[in-house]
Amino acid sequence: MVLNSSDLGPSRCDIRDLPAPSSTNDQGKTELARKKKVKRSNTEIEADASSSDNSCFVALVTASNLRKDALYLPQDLTSSVGLERKYREIVVTDERERRSWALDLRFNKSSDTFYISRGWRSFCDENGKKPGGVFVFKLVGNRETPVLSFCSTESINDGTQGHKNNKYNCMELKSKKKRMRCRDSTSPSQNRFMTLTLTHDNLIKSRRYLPLSFTRDNGLDKPGMIFLLGKTGRKWEANLLREASGRIVLTGKGWKEFAMANGLKSGELFTLEAILEKGTPMLSLVNTQSTNYRSQQGECSRDSEKESSICAEPSRGNKKWKATNNRKERRDSSSAIQNRYVTLTLTPEDVRACTLILPSQFMKANGINKLGKKTLLGQNRKKWFAYLLSKSGFVALGSGWKGFCEANGVKTGESFNLEYIDEQDTTPVFKFCSNSVEYVKFTSLP
């Protein structure tokens, strides 16, 4: 996308319509200062645009990000355009209306994420956006100030003028909007998901308490109606009630029917994602831990066990003791090796929700208990980032999940292996291991 430097307006986030200058000279000075600040060559901008082919994303306006006056940017997108921590400002442009806003840009070290602050609320207010509203942005990185090109959904529908590539990208993005929920930049990815345990009382009483932090961050902390979205796309109507203590409870006949229709059982973990569809809040069932993945048994594990078996001839004295001791050591080594591998099966729900669940025994065997950022390493050493959101093994991968599977030739219904690599002072890695190999031992990154 080619941006016109003349389209970039004043540099403060609270600008609306500029007052008429007192003289022609003042006007000339204002224009000169404005152009100086944002002036860049067309060649430089085109180079930036060509290097970010997949730089569009959907930004959902919520009560939470308006209250916090902050919009988080997708981590994989900011990495792809080379956004650096030194940046303290980002320019939002609307080419159609010839307006621009300069907003503060900050970096959250704990979530490794860039976010817009001190200006997001004013920007939404100026553009008439309330909770449930949607923006479509294209991020362009550059040597001076990063740019967010603003493309409203209205401009897609009415066919107003704009750069051809930008219009195509936005139209394509709109058609894939449901699949991009996981890339919604309203907050860090972990705030949209919650993993709960279904109890017998939940079903009998048709009530389930929701975590306060989850309801608050997703604007679900007020009483009202909510839809529950099942695996097949069917919806159930339920109610959110607020108790005197401030706790939010999900209740109603629809909640019980939703649980039963989707095969949820007492004692089972299930994960819900908070989404908005045409301004209506929904809780979408992502998956359940006990039904989506096979336990850790795969070709890599089985082959490693075969390789580790020892055939020792009968002997006496020290020879017999050494053979027994060696057998034990190798068996322990084999166990440690096979514990590093897990076999998973890709389901349509995984791709749609951009998530996966790691078996609990795999988590325990490798001591995986630290939440936060992880790395997925593909066959060609390409990296994708994921976030471990709970100690029960729930992992959110964002839009990179589909790309990871496509790049490594994994299709829906097929199984694949991951090897866990834990090195000091680095982000833990899950490395792709093809099912076609008999056994591959990885001790560290090459």
UniProtKB/Swiss-Prot annotation:
Source organism phylogeny: Eukaryota, Viridiplantae, Streptophyta, Embryophyta, Tracheophyta
Cross-referenced CDD domains: B3_DNA
GO molecular function: DNA binding
Broad class of the protein's primary localization: nucleus
Cross-referenced SMART domains: B3
Gene Ontology, cellular component aspect: nucleus
Protein name stated in the entry: B3 domain-containing protein REM12
PROSITE patterns: B3
Region feature Disordered, mapped onto this chain: 1-46, 295-334
Keywords: DNA-binding, Nucleus, Repeat, Transcription, Transcription regulation
Transmembrane segments: none
Pfam families: B3
Statement: the UniProt record of this protein carries the keyword Repeat: yes
The keyword Membrane appears for this protein: no
